Amino acid sequence: MSLTLRVLAPDQSVFDGSADEVILPSTTGQVGILPGHVSLLAALDVGVLRVRTNSNWQSIALMGGFAEVESDDVTVLVNSAELGVNIDSTSAESDLSAARTAVTKLEGQPSTPEKVKAQQLFQRARARAQASKST
């Protein structure tokens, strides 16, 4: 018994296949999905979705969205996503370092659009870096 997983972004189908286990980055924490899971609708945070097929794990960097689990079908609708194997880890680490520097520079300051954008860029860079290493 396995799950059917679909990860869909507005411009592409990122993943469409079978999985034995899926770990979702929900806004309330990690949610593990196995065959027979109860129906679920969850908001997703920027983070890494992990997919296990047999003993192999794949990672997908997600930039927020929603997941629906219904009768062993998992549908993930996201703003954008990237397979970990398609992310250059050196470039992702460089982007993460630059984003971390930008956030650190703005620490202690009141919330401004610039600070919010820097924090969002940091979250995205961290998700991409984690997904690039998890493959």
Curated annotation (Swiss-Prot):
Which InterPro entries does UniProt cross-reference here? ATP_synth_F1_dsu/esu, ATP_synth_F1_dsu/esu_N, ATPsynth_dsu/esu_N
Sequence segments annotated as region (Disordered): 101-122
Per UniProt, what is the membrane topology? Answer: Peripheral membrane protein
| A Pfam family reported for this protein in Swiss-Prot or TrEMBL | ATP-synt_DE_N
The yes or no answer to whether the keyword RNA-binding is present is no
An example Gene Ontology molecular-function term: ATP binding
Q: Name one GO cellular component term.
A: proton-transporting ATP synthase complex
User: Could you tell me where this protein is found in the cell?
Assistant: Cellular thylakoid membrane
Gene3D superfamilies noted in UniProt: F0F1 ATP synthase delta/epsilon subunit, N-terminal (2.60.15.10), Helix hairpin bin (1.10.287.540)
Q: Which domain of life is it from?
A: Bacteria
Q: Which UniProt keywords apply?
A: ATP synthesis, CF(1), Hydrogen ion transport, Ion transport, Membrane, Thylakoid, Transport
Quaternary assembly: F-type ATPases have 2 components, CF(1) - the catalytic core - and CF(0) - the membrane proton channel. CF(1) has five subunits: alpha(3), beta(3), gamma(1), delta(1), epsilon(1). CF(0) has three main subunits: a, b and c.
The record describes the protein's role as: Produces ATP from ADP in the presence of a proton gradient across the membrane.
* Family in the record: Belongs to the ATPase epsilon chain family.
Name of the protein described by the UniProt record: ATP synthase epsilon chain
Q: Which gene encodes it?
A: atpC
